């Protein structure tokens, strides 16, 4: 900092003198020192930072700019897993990342539906309600799940156990495998998954893992040519 900044300032002043500028206004300061970085697009990057504005770290910290891998709409366990995966990308190998992803997949499948579901806000529940078809055409997926939840809670007379989803409610939703007994691929709920409806065994853990964990990582891994799983090739076939 004490060497580079004065040198850069002298270069700017030399340039200003060369072009006969009225005043030298250009300033540059050191921001981060990192040993690794991944750029997915302009102004979208991850840095493995050891020094930030003169503050030196004992362990590197991730700096993310324009990267939406960790969002509030992502299930909480996946947010932690994604952060750890990003750290591993900065310090490990592709094989180590793939192994970590498989470990995460195994742990993910042991979690209850409440922990792997997507958090959302239920706006306009009544707007999309339809008497004959439960929900209207074009209903957002989490609202469709909310209307299905309300319908089957009432159908199974579970109103005393589960509160119906109202406008503005904080909810969660998850995908279901088809075919299933409600003939739908989604269900929403408030806090407790509606096990009494009989759809627990249809929770699509593979699709949930794909959308909440793998898809956010793929955008970053693609930028460095890494994969989320081991791929077979002719060379590996003969070894």
Regions found by a protein language model. Name each.
Residues 1-239:
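DNA-dependent DNA polymerase catalytic subunits
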């Amino acid at each position: 900092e004490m060497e580079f900044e004065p040198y850069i300032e002298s270069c700017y002043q030399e340039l200003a003198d060369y072009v006969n500028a009225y005043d030298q206004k250009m300033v540059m300061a050191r921001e981060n020192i990192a040993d690794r970085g991944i750029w997915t697009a302009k102004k979208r990057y991850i840095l493995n930072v050891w020094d930030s504005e003169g503050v030196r770290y004992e362990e590197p910290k991730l700096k993310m700019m324009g990267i939406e891998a960790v969002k509030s709409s992502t299930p909480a366990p996946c947010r932690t897993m994604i952060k750890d995966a990003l750290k591993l990308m900065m310090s490990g190998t592709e094989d180590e990342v793939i192994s970590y992803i498989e470990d995460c997949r195994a742990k993910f499948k042991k979690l209850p539906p409440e922990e792997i579901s997507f958090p959302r806000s239920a706006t306009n529940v009544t707007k999309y309600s339809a008497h004959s078809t439960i929900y209207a055409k074009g209903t957002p997926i989490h609202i469709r799940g909310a209307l299905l939840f309300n319908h089957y809670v009432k159908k199974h007379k579970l109103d005393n156990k589960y509160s119906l989803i109202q406008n503005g409610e904080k909810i969660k939703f998850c995908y279901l495998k088809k075919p299933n007994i409600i003939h739908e691929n989604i269900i929403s709920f408030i806090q407790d998954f509606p096990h009494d409806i009989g759809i627990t065994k249809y929770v699509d853990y593979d699709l949930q893992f794909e959308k909440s964990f793998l898809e956010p990582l793929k955008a970053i891994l693609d930028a460095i040519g890494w994969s989320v799983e081991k791929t077979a090739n002719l060379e590996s076939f003969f070894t």
